[in-house]
């Protein structure tokens, strides 16, 4: 050979044959200070610098003072390649294998770090004054460290310092490994050493816990941290070892659709004692973990905060007993705790709802809906016991959603000696109207006003003896914990899991342990122990018979739902009637496409009208039915009895608006003496109300209180954050996508492009993508471009290459029906198939009107009843104050945060609406789009 000589090292490459060893190797070199600078997959096979056989490549670099002193290592994942045998421990490693030797000026610091990470090493000539140190990386490659920058030098760094030659070398000439480990003695974390965040589930399991673990793991990795799972709750924390495992990106694939907790939960008496917590602290420090995200109930979160308060003393004791080194004690002197509330009872104060509560409510309503058919068949009474030792949330919401006849809860106990008569009178009165079934919901903690327990058997015996009813008791028990998480719990768990990681990274030693809560539809952080204290106050208030205070400690929605159930359940009591001159004829009309909750709202409006002395009128088949066929009739109590559980529209609906014939519409209003109008529907209903309000100037019969209750699966009505039917639609889309994703996973290498409805609003596509784990979503707000498709296809190529045919490897793309006129669902599917080059396949799926759902979800039923009752109250206020012609008497009744809002339709139309696009100007859910991309691994892969 002749010519130019070698000037330096361009790069060094290592090859792994399994993904586990590949990831372990990346982690090993990152601890040494190497930074990832490039990532490649099979889609980059045309890049000459990438090995054609590589399924994955990551290039890592460490910078020196100039390019010749820098080091680049190419890591390659090539299945089937032979692995190196480990060196014999009883011999000198550097004589058995070739080695790559890095310069490092302070080998004593290095030995301390290797010991802390439990990495085996050999030091020469000895550990007290080493000149060279050797370790094996996870692939079996021998890596050396020397404090001689020049291998031909006879003097090491310490001797060179005497001659002034060390000033440049100590700054890290060849590698930032020097700076990385040298800073360990002056900061909480060595530079280049990742923060390690552990997640654990504790206490009773609840649906949505797996979504928490998935979100925490992926967001932690995305934020540059290492994610760990602590298996079997506090028991795993005390045992340590294999109970604490690192989570890789792919380990949590498919977890969104799983119920319970896949990392386990168990009771642990040992953790309640200091010796148990001491072992737990040792296990965490050994694993390098100083942050824990705990998902559980108030007991689990209390235990976590006690652990944090004990931490400094535990670390000192471990240091004093030499169980850990002084360096470890300094490095892990603080513990960060973040709490997430996983509880089906929804019994935690300071948050509107807990993870798992709505899924449990789904199970209860499914059971009661099923029981109803057999109860009607045999004219039976059923006593259904639900969970809730100190909280009646499940019982109240279940009673409201299923139309139960009576409910017993701990916060509002039945009056001792009187509840028996109240129950019997209530059930017998509806039986006289022709009702064939009786449903009584009982919380397991139900009591009377003297704190005597009320059991289902007590109620059964009463009904049998007094009313001679064929009565059965059904205890749902752990059925309430089972099943897949519902759409809301998946969304809530994901959003709170994301914020929990951010809370860890923002935490300081002086910050109180936060609890991630949701208040007013926003994720918030609350002081953990304050929330626990308020939760315990509820039980204390009940014990002290301070029942009003116990109700005050619950969230405002709870009391509102209880009042709604009372107002729509008990038979007309004339003592609650308004004065005769204030009684109204209230018309109810459905406008637009069917949506879950329309019938529930109608039922609640009818029953509350009757309870207040008003006359409810149903307009059949929308405005066209009203104008062409004079389709209007009164509704009675029993007419709407089963409507709360029915989907669709019992009185018929279409998209016609009153501008078909505004004058004739006004005549019909006058003819039937309509005093108030409830319009239940979507954007067409919003348009109809706007038209009627604008026509008041010409038609006096429209000068009455009017309101729209938004009901559309698209959730595109301005003036509210949620429309009735959107939760039912999300659950229908979720179940559909879970099914096709299962098919895609079975085929291993398949992606489904699923078209969802929503009009020009991307709500269903965006939130649907979040709760189903979609790889990509396309919405009208963002449109579709060729570059967008190219990036998503490249991402799919890389994903399928990395998954290498493993289970749960199916991919999903959600496309809104109006996202693009050019890039249709079929076109996108064909483009993906063509670009895949048979590495994977693409199929399209269009659920169509299946998305409207069957029976409405409990959330839509409860919201519908609440809004309908508030509408009647609003009409009464307008009537009493003679506001019929005031713009404020034509309103959109919506949900903003946890409260019910009344917004003038004129103001909403002028300030909050994109009329041409038929959607609100500001959508609270838009930020979720970026989160979908992150959790799909796009930003991570980049």
Curated annotation (Swiss-Prot):
Region annotation (N-terminal catalytic PFK domain 1) ranges: 1-570
Binding sites annotated in the UniProt record for Mg(2+): 298
Residues that bind beta-D-fructose 2,6-bisphosphate: 655, 712-716, 750, 757-759, 817, 843, 849-852, 918
Catalytic center residues: 345 (proton acceptor)
Alphabetical list of NCBIfam families matching this protein: 6PF1K_euk
Quaternary context: Homooctamer.
Family that this chain belongs to: Belongs to the phosphofructokinase type A (PFKA) family. ATP-dependent PFK group I subfamily. Eukaryotic two domain clade 'E' sub-subfamily.
Name this polypeptide is given: ATP-dependent 6-phosphofructokinase
Species of origin: Schizosaccharomyces pombe (strain 972 / ATCC 24843) (Fission yeast)
Species lineage: Eukaryota, Fungi, Dikarya, Ascomycota, Taphrinomycotina
